[in-house]
Protein backbone atom coordinates (compact mmCIF):
# COMPACT_ATOMS: atom_id res chain seq x y z
CA UNK A 1 0.00 0.00 0.00
CA UNK A 2 1.30 3.47 -0.80
CA UNK A 3 1.33 6.38 1.61
CA UNK A 4 -1.09 8.20 -0.67
CA UNK A 5 -3.85 5.77 0.33
CA UNK A 6 -3.69 6.91 3.95
CA UNK A 7 -4.61 10.53 3.38
CA UNK A 8 -7.61 12.84 3.41
CA UNK A 9 -9.45 13.44 0.14
CA UNK A 10 -12.22 15.61 1.61
CA UNK A 11 -12.59 17.76 4.71
CA UNK A 12 -16.04 19.08 5.56
CA UNK A 13 -16.91 21.38 8.42
CA UNK A 14 -20.15 21.70 10.32
CA UNK A 15 -21.97 24.54 8.58
CA UNK A 16 -23.30 25.83 11.91
CA UNK A 17 -19.91 27.45 12.50
CA UNK A 18 -20.35 30.95 11.12
CA UNK A 19 -18.12 34.02 11.13
CA UNK A 20 -17.47 37.28 9.40
CA UNK A 21 -13.84 37.39 10.52
CA UNK A 22 -11.71 37.16 7.39
CA UNK A 23 -8.63 36.12 9.38
CA UNK A 24 -10.48 33.08 10.74
CA UNK A 25 -11.91 32.25 7.32
CA UNK A 26 -8.42 32.43 5.80
CA UNK A 27 -6.91 30.21 8.54
CA UNK A 28 -9.65 27.65 8.01
CA UNK A 29 -9.33 27.62 4.23
CA UNK A 30 -5.55 27.23 4.39
CA UNK A 31 -5.79 24.39 6.91
CA UNK A 32 -8.26 22.51 4.69
CA UNK A 33 -6.12 23.01 1.58
CA UNK A 34 -3.00 21.86 3.41
CA UNK A 35 -4.79 18.76 4.70
CA UNK A 36 -5.97 17.87 1.20
CA UNK A 37 -2.52 18.43 -0.31
CA UNK A 38 -0.52 16.49 2.26
CA UNK A 39 -1.78 14.45 5.19
CA UNK A 40 -1.10 11.16 6.90
CA UNK A 41 -4.42 9.82 8.15
CA UNK A 42 -4.68 6.15 9.15
CA UNK A 43 -7.88 4.94 10.86
CA UNK A 44 -6.91 2.14 13.25
CA UNK A 45 -7.71 -1.26 11.76
CA UNK A 46 -8.66 0.08 8.35
CA UNK A 47 -6.83 -1.08 5.25
CA UNK A 48 -6.66 2.00 3.07
CA UNK A 49 -8.25 5.18 1.90
CA UNK A 50 -8.29 7.91 0.93
CA UNK A 51 -10.67 9.22 3.59
CA UNK A 52 -13.35 11.84 4.10
CA UNK A 53 -13.39 13.77 7.37
CA UNK A 54 -16.30 15.78 8.69
CA UNK A 55 -15.81 17.78 11.88
CA UNK A 56 -18.84 18.85 13.88
CA UNK A 57 -19.86 19.68 17.45
CA UNK A 58 -22.20 17.56 19.58
CA UNK A 59 -22.89 18.04 23.29
CA UNK A 60 -19.88 20.33 23.67
CA UNK A 61 -17.48 17.87 22.04
CA UNK A 62 -15.77 17.84 18.70
CA UNK A 63 -16.85 14.91 16.56
CA UNK A 64 -14.60 13.51 13.86
CA UNK A 65 -16.71 11.53 11.37
CA UNK A 66 -14.45 9.41 9.18
CA UNK A 67 -15.63 7.72 5.98
CA UNK A 68 -13.93 6.14 2.99
CA UNK A 69 -13.66 7.99 -0.31
CA UNK A 70 -17.07 6.66 -1.39
CA UNK A 71 -18.73 7.96 1.80
CA UNK A 72 -19.08 4.65 3.69
CA UNK A 73 -18.84 5.31 7.44
CA UNK A 74 -15.71 3.97 9.12
CA UNK A 75 -15.73 5.51 12.59
CA UNK A 76 -16.81 8.58 14.55
CA UNK A 77 -14.66 9.84 17.39
CA UNK A 78 -15.97 12.24 20.04
CA UNK A 79 -13.21 14.42 21.43
CA UNK A 80 -13.51 16.38 24.66
CA UNK A 81 -12.15 19.90 24.42
CA UNK A 82 -11.35 20.07 28.15
CA UNK A 83 -7.72 18.88 27.77
CA UNK A 84 -7.21 21.59 25.13
CA UNK A 85 -8.72 24.48 27.13
CA UNK A 86 -5.45 26.07 28.29
CA UNK A 87 -3.74 25.60 24.93
CA UNK A 88 -6.70 27.01 22.99
CA UNK A 89 -6.88 30.05 25.25
CA UNK A 90 -3.11 30.63 25.11
CA UNK A 91 -3.14 30.18 21.33
CA UNK A 92 -6.07 32.58 20.98
CA UNK A 93 -4.33 35.28 23.04
CA UNK A 94 -1.07 34.77 21.16
CA UNK A 95 -2.79 35.04 17.77
CA UNK A 96 -4.57 38.23 18.83
CA UNK A 97 -1.25 39.63 20.02
CA UNK A 98 0.30 38.73 16.70
CA UNK A 99 -2.47 40.44 14.71
CA UNK A 100 -2.13 43.57 16.86
CA UNK A 101 1.66 43.53 16.57
CA UNK A 102 1.44 43.35 12.78
CA UNK A 103 0.10 46.88 12.82
CA UNK A 104 2.24 48.35 15.58
CA UNK A 105 5.43 46.41 16.23
CA UNK A 106 8.77 45.83 14.65
CA UNK A 107 9.96 42.63 13.00
CA UNK A 108 11.76 41.33 16.10
CA UNK A 109 8.56 41.58 18.18
CA UNK A 110 6.58 39.73 15.49
CA UNK A 111 9.20 36.98 15.33
CA UNK A 112 9.15 36.54 19.12
CA UNK A 113 5.36 36.29 19.19
CA UNK A 114 5.40 33.86 16.26
CA UNK A 115 7.95 31.65 18.00
CA UNK A 116 5.66 31.45 21.04
CA UNK A 117 2.66 30.72 18.82
CA UNK A 118 4.52 27.87 17.11
CA UNK A 119 5.47 26.38 20.48
CA UNK A 120 1.84 26.37 21.65
CA UNK A 121 0.77 24.98 18.27
CA UNK A 122 3.29 22.12 18.52
CA UNK A 123 2.18 21.26 22.06
CA UNK A 124 -1.49 21.25 21.04
CA UNK A 125 -0.77 19.15 17.93
CA UNK A 126 1.00 16.53 20.03
CA UNK A 127 -1.91 16.43 22.48
CA UNK A 128 -4.31 16.02 19.53
CA UNK A 129 -2.25 13.10 18.20
CA UNK A 130 -2.43 11.43 21.61
CA UNK A 131 -6.19 12.03 21.99
CA UNK A 132 -6.98 10.68 18.51
CA UNK A 133 -4.57 7.73 18.65
CA UNK A 134 -7.22 5.18 19.71
CA UNK A 135 -9.15 5.76 16.48
CA UNK A 136 -6.76 7.32 13.95
CA UNK A 137 -3.01 7.68 13.54
CA UNK A 138 -1.84 11.04 12.20
CA UNK A 139 1.58 12.56 11.66
CA UNK A 140 2.82 15.80 13.23
CA UNK A 141 1.99 18.00 10.22
CA UNK A 142 -1.54 16.60 9.96
CA UNK A 143 -2.02 17.15 13.70
CA UNK A 144 -0.85 20.77 13.35
CA UNK A 145 -3.27 21.40 10.49
CA UNK A 146 -6.15 19.77 12.36
CA UNK A 147 -5.41 21.88 15.43
CA UNK A 148 -5.46 25.00 13.25
CA UNK A 149 -8.83 23.89 11.93
CA UNK A 150 -10.17 23.23 15.44
CA UNK A 151 -8.99 26.66 16.56
CA UNK A 152 -10.56 28.31 13.51
CA UNK A 153 -13.84 26.49 14.06
CA UNK A 154 -14.03 27.50 17.71
CA UNK A 155 -12.97 31.06 16.92
CA UNK A 156 -15.77 31.22 14.34
CA UNK A 157 -18.20 30.41 17.12
CA UNK A 158 -16.85 33.16 19.39
CA UNK A 159 -19.48 32.41 21.99
CA UNK A 160 -17.95 28.98 22.54
CA UNK A 161 -17.11 28.62 26.22
CA UNK A 162 -13.65 27.16 25.63
CA UNK A 163 -12.35 30.45 24.23
CA UNK A 164 -14.02 32.59 26.89
CA UNK A 165 -12.40 31.12 30.00
UniProtKB/Swiss-Prot annotation:
It holds the Pfam family UPF0262. The keyword Iron-sulfur does not apply. InterPro entries: UCP032146. Keywords: Plasmid. Coiled coil: none annotated. HAMAP family: UPF0262. Belongs to the UPF0262 family. This is UPF0262 protein y4uD.
Amino acid sequence: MTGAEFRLCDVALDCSFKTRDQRVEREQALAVLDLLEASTFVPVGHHGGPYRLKISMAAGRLVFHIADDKGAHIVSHHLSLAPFRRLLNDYSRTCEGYYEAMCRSNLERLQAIDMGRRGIHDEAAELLRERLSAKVDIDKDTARRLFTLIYALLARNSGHQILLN
